[in-house]
Structure formats: structure tokens, C-alpha cells
């Protein structure tokens, strides 16, 4: 009888855990641009063995529809080098904004200023204008931000001497912005910045950690960029909400009564 109860408890616990665990999934758009020639976001996620919904072909055809399970929309570095993707992202601005408003996170790392100087799919009140300036100098403004904390503790040294061909750590620094909180800067201009929107958030960067992880000039660049990709996913996707942890603890507390 006790064994039967134990089996029942384990089965119920598994069911309840699945119901309170975050059903977060990644949606991506990615492109092998003319400079790096690699679809680095895909390759990085495949290396990490992380499943994702690839909407690139749909976006090329002009549509962007998110699944209910999607929690993070990650646009690969230099994706807008593909003019069809650039134009379609702009045309689907409402879809992107609604995704964030409902609680989704949107991340866009480095884009070439000649392809996407102004990020036109951002909502009213938020602006991001990219430039052609690259820089090896930078400063972390918010060292306690979660993106530098887990699973890898990272500081300014972690980002030093990144490179791809002749480009340094900061690639296409953000020239101007409105409505964002700056997390890292270079030449007193934003490098990483984020803004809350509805229940979600927009994260813009002048870093290309996906490209640098796959196509960096040296092992240090590839390693550190990979560690930062892990941190991005942890900070903006995998972190378990406090309320979910509370529910799980409550469930376990009730089930212990069977023993």
C-alpha cells in the first residue's frame, strides 16, 4: 500500500512540477551575413543543445507569428544584412511589440548601421540608433546586473580583446537612444541597454557574442563570448520566477503528508 502511495505521489509531483515550471522557449531569426559568413545564433544554440523555433523563413516571406510558449525572441547579430529580413521585421513591428507587451523578451545584438541605423520596430517612446563606430574600450555601468552574474561571473576583463577580423569588442556602438537603461557603455555611448515594455523587455546591444563565439579571431574571444551567451540566456530566459518557486514548495509540502 505504501509503495502504491509513493508511486502516486511521484506521478502527481511530476505532473504538478511540469505545470509550474517555466515553459520558456526561444524564437529566433538568424542570417549568415556578408562579413562573418556564419549563422552563429543557430550554431551556438545547437552547441548548447537548446531547442528553438526558427522563424527566419517565415519572416523572409513577410510573416512573424509567435507561439504561446515563446518567451524570448532573439534576433541574430547582423541579421538585417538580409534586406528581406530587415524589411519584414519592420513590417511586423506590432507583432514584436505585442510579444514584449505580453511578457516576452526581445534581444537584438549588433547590426550594421548601413543595414539598420534606426531600429524602426521599437514602440513609441523607445529609440535605438546605431553607428559605424567600433571600439575596444568600454565600461560596465551596472556590474551587479544579472547578465554579468550567472552562470558565469563576468567583469570588464571578461570582455577585453574580443575580436573578429579587424573588429574589436564593441561593434557598431549605439549612437543615441531614448527610454533605455544603459548597462554597459563605450565612448560614453550605449553598448548594452534594456527597457521594460508592458510585462516584457527590449534588450539592445553593440556586441555580437553569437558571431564572436563561432567566428572569433582566437580561443579567448570564442570562449568568453560563449560564456556571455550563456549569461544572456540565463538572465532573460532560464531564471525561474519567484512565484513559481513558491508554488513548487507549496506542492511539495502538501504531498509530504502522504508519507
Where are these regions (language model features)?
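Bacterial N-terminal signal peptides that target proteins for export
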Residues: 1-9
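A glycine-rich, often tryptophan-bearing local segment used as a flexible ligand/cofactor-contacting loop or short
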Residues: 79-166, 170-176, 221-230
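Flexible, charged surface loops at secondary-structure boundaries
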Residues: 65-69, 100-101, 174-178, 196-198
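Extracellular ligand-binding/catalytic regions of CAZymes and related secreted enzymes
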Residues: 22-30, 35-36, 117, 179-181, ...
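Short secondary-structure junctions
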Residues: 52-54, 127-131, 178-184
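A short acidic, often aromatic-flanked loop/helix-cap motif at beta-alpha or helix-coil junctions
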Residues: 59-65, 136-139, 146, 191
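Helical hinge/lid and interdomain linker segments adjacent to catalytic or ligand-binding clefts
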Residues: 25-120
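Bacterial N-terminal signal peptides
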Residues: 8-18
